[in-house]
A protein has these predicted regions:
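N-terminal subdomain of nucleotide-sugar transferases
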Residues: 1-44, 156, 176, 180
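Membrane-proximal helix-turn-helix segments that form the acceptor-binding/catalytic region
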Residues: 23, 82-89, 104, 108-112, ...
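Structural motif
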Residues: 94-95, 156
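N-terminal beta-loop-helix "entrance" segment that forms/cooperates
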Residues: 44-53
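A short, charged, and often flexible helix/loop element on the N-terminal side
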Residues: 52-82, 132-135
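Donor nucleotide-sugar binding/catalytic pocket of nucleotide-sugar-dependent glycosyltransferases
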Residues: 39, 54-57, 140, 144-189
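Nucleotide-sugar donor phosphate/pyrophosphate-binding loop at the beta->alpha transition
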Residues: 78, 116, 126-149, 185-187
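An aromatic- and histidine-rich active-site surface loop
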Residues: 14, 77-81, 95-127, 162
């Protein structure tokens, strides 16, 4: 299977989502899937069989990208989406694995290229934005609407916990597969 994995974070870094992405890549590699990963310009190299990592251009003015919403991530996401568009226009993919906010990129790619996607959901972005930036509260319904669109159009939504799965049930996803975080007592490399 040819898979495009959108990883909107520095990869690899020894923290949360990049660790989860590394575990996913290890599993897909062992299964023999061919995976193209698009990620940010920062992060250390990790090599797996059948996996090709594509990085956005080196944005020297952007460094130390932290988890959560930020202008740095927003700029990097624009470059990530452009790179995804270029790759999808050159190569056929069977599936897109969209991590966090890249689900909106995957939704657009689905509409234009008919590629189904799975939504790797670590949090409710609508809730996260409103909690972090209270001035956005009046726009909560807009964020919820786009989250609903992303959930409804996903082939599968993979939230990290039952509480998150419960919070998206109202959006009527096609299929939900809760994939909880795992113990990381062993080395990933």
């Amino acid at each position: 299977m040819n898979i495009l994995l959108l990883a909107p974070e520095p990869f690899y870094e020894d923290r949360g989502t990049p660790i989860a992405v590394a575990l996913i890549l290890r599993g897909l590699s062992e299964r023999g899937d061919l995976v193209d990963v698009i990620t940010y310009h920062q992060g250390s190299e990790v090599k797996y069989e059948h996996i090709t990592v594509h990085r956005i251009c080196n944005l020297r003015f952007i460094c130390n990208i932290r988890p959560g919403f930020s202008w740095k991530k927003l700029v990097c996401d624009i470059f990530l989406f452009v790179k995804a568009l270029r790759l999808v226009s050159r190569k056929r993919f069977d599936l897109i694995h969209a991590v966090e906010e890249s689900v909106f990129m995957a939704l657009i790619l689905k509409w234009f290229y008919k590629i189904p996607y799975v939504y790797d959901m670590d949090s409710s972005m609508a809730q996260q934005l409103v909690e972090k930036y209270s001035f956005l509260r009046p726009f909560r319904f807009v964020f919820k609407y786009f989250e609903k669109l992303a959930v409804k159009n996903a082939l599968v939504v993979m939230p990290v916990c039952d509480a998150l799965a419960g919070s998206i049930a109202e959006h009527m996803p096609k299929k939900v597969a809760v994939v909880p975080d795992v113990s990381l007592l062993t080395d990933l490399n």
